[in-house]
Amino acid sequence: INIDIFQKGYEGKTGTAAVLAAIDDGKAYMWVRGSFDAFAWFGGSGGTIVLIIAILLFSKRADYLTVGKLSLGPGIFNINEPIMFGLPVVLNPIMFIPFVIAPLVATTIGWVATYLGLVAPVSQQVAWVTPPLLLSFLATGADWRAPIVALVCMVVTFLIWTPFVIAANKMDPALGESEQ
């Protein structure tokens, strides 16, 4: 879904020509599809690498810790399916709230930093599997401030995820299982 929404206008020669014409006219976009990868989607949608770190630091549930440990490697490279479906984040009312709110807040921080000129706009297409802080550095054309802004976004995302991880400690992992 994200590809259809964010990338269709930039595909092919027509999209490239439109972007180059906008740059020539001084009307280049300040926020593009790659900006989400650089400043909001750490470890994948929802900032799930930060969720994994919060689980490893604060979770007391053995099932969450196991999934967190197994998801850390893929999460570093923005592959979040192990945590999304292993925890699960999908269809989990406790995890749904920060999954939606954290990227919104991180996007706002990244956009404001870009708009105010605190960081260069994302101008380079970087492979989505590049680890988060390196991705922001490369995507902004090697702006050394980009990983700092990305780290601020990650810390705020961590602060959003942590209370929900702690709340999940109070849930009984055996709920919903029938005894046989």
Language model segments and positions:
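Transmembrane alpha-helical segments and their short flanking loops
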Residues: E11-R33, M84-Q180
